Structure formats: C-alpha cells, structure tokens
Swiss-Prot record:
Keywords: ATP-binding, Cell cycle, Cell division, DNA damage, DNA recombination, DNA repair, DNA replication, Ligase, Magnesium, Metal-binding, Nucleotide-binding. It catalyses: ATP + (deoxyribonucleotide)n-3'-hydroxyl + 5'-phospho-(deoxyribonucleotide)m = (deoxyribonucleotide)n+m + AMP + diphosphate. The active site is at K246 (n6-amp-lysine intermediate). GO terms for molecular function: ATP binding; DNA binding; DNA ligase (ATP) activity; metal ion binding. Belongs to the ATP-dependent DNA ligase family. The gene is lig. It is an enzyme of class 6 (ligase). InterPro entries: ATP-dep_DNA_ligase, DNA_ligae_ATP-dep_bac/arc, DNA_ligase_ATP-dep, DNA_ligase_ATP-dep_C, DNA_ligase_ATP-dep_cent, DNA_ligase_ATP-dep_CS, DNA_ligase_ATP-dep_N, DNA_ligase_N_sf. One of its GO terms (biological process) is cell division. This is DNA ligase. ATP binds at E244, R251, R266, E295, F334, R405, K411. It comes from Methanoregula boonei (strain DSM 21154 / JCM 14090 / 6A8). DNA ligase that seals nicks in double-stranded DNA during DNA replication, DNA recombination and DNA repair. Pfam families: DNA_ligase_A_C, DNA_ligase_A_M, DNA_ligase_A_N.
Length: 550
C-alpha cells in the first residue's frame, strides 16, 4: 500500500462521525493489505506506531518536527511556527506549508506504508543527544517525499496524535467484519497479545490463528478496570460479593518466568529498574511462573503514604538504593492471570483467588466474602480507618476482562466529585508565576477525539506548577499570545463542585469551581473521562437536586 492511499483513507475517516461508517471504511481497506502491511495500517489508523505493550518511543517532539518541516519545505522556522499557531493543528499546517514549498527533492520517491514505518522505527532506535540531527534528517526526508495530504497525516503520526476519531473498539469491529471472523475471537486475541496490528495479521489467516493465541510472560496485558457503584446494588444484583481494600497506590503487573522477573505499570511501561525491591519481594514469594495483578503502596509507620510518594518511586531512574531507604514499598496482589503455562483469565474470580493464595500467599490482598450489607459496610469503614481509599467489590463468578471497565468490579469510596482529564492547553501565569503555566485547558474524550471541558487554575502549589511546567514544556505544539496548546500526554485528576451546562466549551458542559487534585502519571489519555459518562454524571446530579428540593 502506498502511503498516499493510507492518507486518502484517513481523510475519508476524518470527515465521518458515525462509528458504523468508520467500521465500513476500515473493513474495506483491510483485506487487500499484505501481511506485513496489516499491523502498520492498523496501528497508524489509531495514531500509533508501536503496540501498547512496547517500550519503544519515537522520540520526536514538536520542536524536532518543526525543524524537519523547515528543512523539507525550504522555509524559515518562524514561518512553520506561525502557520501552526494560526491553524492550531500541526497536520493541516504542514499540509499548507508543503503545498507552497519551493524546494524540490531530486530523489523523490512515492512513499510506501511499510517504508514509512521502517524509517520511523529506525528513528526510535536512535538515542542520545547526537541522534537528534539524524532524527530530523530522516523526518525531513520523509516529509520531502510527501504530498501535502500525506504530510498532514505523516506529521500527526510522528506526534502519535492522528485526530481522526478512530479508537480500538472501531478497529476491532472492522477486523472482524473484514475477515469474517467472530468478534469474540478478535477480542480474545487482543486480550492475549495487546496489539491490534498483530491481531489483524492473525485474523487474515483465519479463526484458528486467533483462537490459538495465549497470554505469555513479559508481554503485558491491559488491566481490568472498575466502575462506580453501590454496596446495595452489587448485593441485589449478585448476592454474594467479595470485598477488598482499595489502595491509594499504583497498579502493577508482575511477570515471572524462571529466574527472570519484570514489573509493568498501569500504562504497561516497564518499571522494573525503579522497583527492584518489589520485584525481589514477589520473586521470593513464589517459585512459579506467573503474571500477577496488584497495587503497590508506600508505607511509613505502618500507615499508607500519599499516592504521590508512590509515583516518585515509579519515576525514579537514578539513586534507586537511596529511594528504597526513603520510601518502603509493599505490594498487594489481588489477581492472577497466568500460572505455569496456563492462561487463567476465563476462570471465575473465586477460582483464580484460590490459585493466587496457594501460589503467592504472603502478599495477597485481604478479602471478605459476604451477602450481608452490614459486613461489607464494616469492611469499607475498616479500610478508611486504615488509611486506604475505600473498597473494591468483585463478582466471584466473573472472568478477568483485560482493558474493560465493567460491572464485575465496583469501587466504593467517599463521595468526592473528581474527573480524570487530559491537559491540552494552558495560559502563562502572572506575577511570580509568569515563568510557568498558570491555568490549564482540560478535555474529556468522545469517540477517540479530545473535547475541551474546562479550565483549571486553582489547587496548585508553586512546586506543583514547576513540576507540571517541566513535564509539559517540550509538548507545546502551538502558541498564540499567552495561550499554548500541547500534544496531549498528561492527565490531571480534577475536583469540582458541580457540572453545569455551558456553551463555552465544546463538551457542552463546564465545571463549577474546578481545582487540581493530582497528576495521574499512571493513566494515559485513552483512559480519561468520556463525554457519555459526564452526561450521565450530570443527569444523576440533576436527579439528586430534584429529590433534595421535594
């Protein structure tokens, strides 16, 4: 497939809003692709280059891309930045610049999809400061051979932000339709290998290839997620339920095979180097080959420390021994996905729990199983008294569903209205805060697109604003006066008094008294609040207000 053909598919998708229409367009494109083209097409159409489980990073930020565009088009850097600021969209700005370029490439060639992929993966393998020139050179050569339309999507892919609204669910359905296989088989394979690109390649071979895929160590699996609910509702729906403490720590996945062991974060990043003490504890706790799911917390004086203490350990890359002395980490394991060559995710939770207690023992999270609401309520109060966030309620007969947020896991914690939102823009601060960003534009998601919801300017200490500035300064993609826009990569937890209907933001809502709570380093922008869930919150809020006034 030529990259120009891929760009035409993207342009068609960009003008669609209906999910079924998107599925149709993608499913038409997939069958004619060669086996080596399928993984590339699928990842690219979702704005990705590497599978979620991969530790590879492209390493091209906005500034490197702007320099590559400058060289490819033969224009001044100021021209590139001005056009991007005017457009507010890197892709369309690059398209305009390439349409008017005066510099001609004498070695022009038609770009092929796999060729572009190979060049980009080559960029990712180059490390160190001296590699920046080589990254710019490769990006410049690709852009130099690109048509204006190709340039629009090539630039966005380099920033891994395609902005055409295609999410995993859409692509899963398109794969099933294109190759006439059961969508449950596509889901099974995705749960096992966590790479829709590879799933598409297997689907082309047929249903047997999909069903033969299994979970393996050192290939992290997306973690099962919980939604909000009530104790009464869970008992009414399921009778007997399992209650566990909800820890204010960081989710982890522990993989062990033989003498080798690694740990992965909620975002599937390998954090083994930062947590050698936790790996050592779990490795000594079991002699089996396992994949475990759990939460690690920081402990001081037998009490859990704040979430930020855990994050500091996850971020640490140097002076690990010193950090181990300062912050003691304790793992709490609550599930097992793999044991000695056997995938366990389809087993009922109570069976997985029995295996877990046999295999690990010491670090298994405490659990209470009951049909009695008062017993579960007491467990909830015990959790709060011990300094934890609340409790998790789980259905004993439920399977483990990687990456899904369903009714089989429910979180119960004190009523605090917060949302996890992506940071997409900011304004510079004033006075003593003029050297950092002072307020932030945050967004929810809707069908794979980020939708502005509110601005957040309170709740930050000076130290936190400096930390956020350091995290975001290299992610700036455009500037207009005091306003900047970011490549979306950071998630804030934002508190608020209430949701209000508002025409100010594209979401149609605004937050009353929004305040910064914390950075969610453990989440990426695909896990933020959806517009649908915000509508649901608003409806529940309205019903509560009506009940109060009666």
């Amino acid at each position: 497939m030529l990259f120009s053909e891929f760009a035409q598919v993207c342009e068609e998708l960009e003008h669609l809003s209906g999910r079924l229409d998107m599925i149709e367009v993608i499913s038409r494109a997939l069958p004619d692709l060669a086996p080596d083209e399928l993984p590339v097409f699928v990842r690219f159409v979702m704005g990705r280059i590497f599978p979620d489980w991969s530790a590879q990073k492209l390493g091209i930020g906005p500034n490197l891309l702007y320099e590559a565009v400058r060289q490819a088009a033969g224009v001044k850097l100021e021209t590139v930045i001005t056009r991007i600021n005017q457009q507010g969209d890197v892709g369309r700005a690059v398209e305009d610049i390439l349409a008017k370029k005066t510099q001609v490439s004498w070695s022009h060639q038609d770009l092929e999809l796999v060729y572009v992929y190979n060049k980009l993966t080559g960029i990712s393998s180059r490390g160190g400061v001296t590699s920046q020139k080589e990254k710019i050179r490769i990006a410049m050569l690709l852009l130099g051979d690109a048509s204006p339309l190709e340039g629009r999507y090539l630039a966005r892919i380099m920033l891994e932000e395609l902005r055409i609204g295609v999410g995993e669910g859409t692509v899963r359905e398109a794969i099933a339709k294109a190759f006439m296989v059961d969508s449950a088989l596509v889901e099974h394979a995705m749960q096992a290998i966590n790479d829709l690109g590879e799933v598409a390649r297997l689907a082309k071979k047929g249903p047997t290839a999909l069903s033969d895929v299994h979970i393996t160590p050192f290939h992290p699996v997306k973690m099962m997620l919980a939604q909000q609910g009530t104790i009464a509702g869970m008992i009414e729906d399921h009778g007997e339920i399992a209650a566990e403490y909800k820890y204010d720590g960081s989710r982890f996945q522990f993989h062990k095979e033989g003498a080798k062991a690694r740990m992965y974060s909620r975002r599937l990043e390998d954090v083994s180097e930062a947590l050698p003490d936790v790996i050592d504890l779990l490795s000594k706790a079991t002699s089996h080959d396992v994949i475990l799911d759990g939460e690690v917390i920081a402990i001081k004086d037998d009490r859990p420390m704040p979430f930020q203490s855990v994050l500091r350990r996850f971020r640490r890359r140097h002076d690990i021994a010193e950090a181990q002395e300062a912050i003691r980490m304790v793992p709490n394991v609550f599930d097992i996905l793999y044991l000695d060559g056997e995938t366990l995710i389809d087993l009922p939770f109570f069976e997985r729990r029995k295996k877990l207690e046999t295999v690990v023992g010491k670090f298994v999270a405490p659990q209470v199983v009951s049909t009695d609401p008062q017993t579960i309520e007491q467990t909830y109060h015990d959790a709060l008294a011990a300094g934890h966030e609340g409790i998790m309620l789980k259905v004993p007969a439920s399977p483990y569903t990687p990456g899904q947020r369903g009714k089989n896991w429910i979180k119960i914690k004190p009523e605090v209205d917060t949302l996890d939102l992506a940071v997409i823009g900011a304004e510079w601060g004033e006075g003593k805060r003029a050297h950092v960003f002072g307020s932030f534009l945050v967004a929810c998601q809707d069908q794979g697109k980020l939708i502005p919801l509110s601005r957040v300017a309170t709740g930050f200490s000076d130290e936190q604003l400096t930390e956020v500035y350091d995290l975001l300064k290299d992610a700036v993609i455009s500037r207009t006066g005091k306003e900047v826009r970011f490549e979306p990569e950071l998630v804030f937890e934002v508190g608020y008094a209430e949701l209000q209907v508002s025409p100010t933001y594209d979401a149609g809502f605004a937050l009353r008294f929004p305040r910064f709570i914390r950075i969610r380093d453990d989440k990426d922008t695909t896990e933020i609040e959806t517009l649908e869930s915000i509508r649901g919150r608003y409806q529940r809020q309205a019903k509560s207000a009506q009940a109060y006034t009666k």
